[in-house]
């Protein structure tokens, strides 16, 4: 074997040996990762199909915090939105009287173009992460609908 070939083989073995720890480190973190599906939906929680707006996609993520006894007030979202409750207890009401109760760790596909009100009905402040799937310069994320409040007799 030529001296050049022996030197090349030695260098290759040394490089492979040096990179071996990095290869095992790349595998280890994936073995320590746990994936839990929070939501998989084709419809909002009130049964309406989810449709994305046209145009350049723009995703917005918000942390929404509601104090004890607080509420969002009546509003609607013209774009699809998806939330995960981190803390507190959330009650979402529709004008037709339907309600959805969320506890920490639960997720939902919010209603689209439907007036609703979210209230913190728990005993601790509420924290909710919501992602909105909108389009650049198209619709707002939320539109107030104070006239949608259900009438009480």
Describe each region flagged by the PLM.
Residues 2-5, 12-13, 19-60, 109, ...:
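A short, N-terminal "cap"/entry segment at the start of jelly-roll beta-barrel domains
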Residues 53-58, 69-84:
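A short beta-loop-beta micro-motif enriched in histidine and acidic residues
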Residues 56-61, 77, 87, 113, ...:
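Extracytoplasmic
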Residues 65, 91, 129-132:
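Soluble periplasmic/extracytoplasmic beta-strand elements of cell-envelope proteins
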Residues 66, 96-113:
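Short acidic-glycine-tyrosine-enriched beta hairpin
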Residues 71-73, 108, 112-119:
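Histidine-centered metal-chelating micro-motifs
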Residues 77-96, 106:
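Glycine- and acidic-residue-biased ligand/ion/polar-headgroup-sensing regions
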Residues 113-138:
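Ligand-binding loop in jelly-roll beta-barrel domains
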């Amino acid at each position: 074997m030529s001296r050049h070939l022996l030197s090349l083989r030695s260098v290759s073995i040394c490089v492979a040996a040096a990179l071996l720890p990095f290869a095992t480190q790349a595998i280890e973190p994936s073995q320590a990762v746990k994936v839990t599906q929070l939501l998989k939906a084709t419809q909002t929680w009130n049964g309406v199909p989810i449709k994305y707006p046209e145009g350049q996609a723009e995703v917005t993520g918000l942390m929404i915090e509601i104090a004890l006894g607080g509420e969002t007030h009546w509003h609607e979202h013209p774009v699809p939105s998806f939330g995960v409750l981190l803390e507190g207890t959330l009650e979402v009401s529709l004008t037709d009287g339907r309600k959805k109760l969320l506890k920490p760790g639960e997720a939902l596909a919010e209603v689209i173009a439907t007036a609703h009100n979210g209230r913190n009905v728990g005993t601790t402040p509420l924290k909710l992460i919501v992602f909105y799937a909108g389009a650049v310069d198209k619709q707002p994320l939320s539109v107030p609908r104070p006239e949608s409040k259900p009438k009480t007799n």
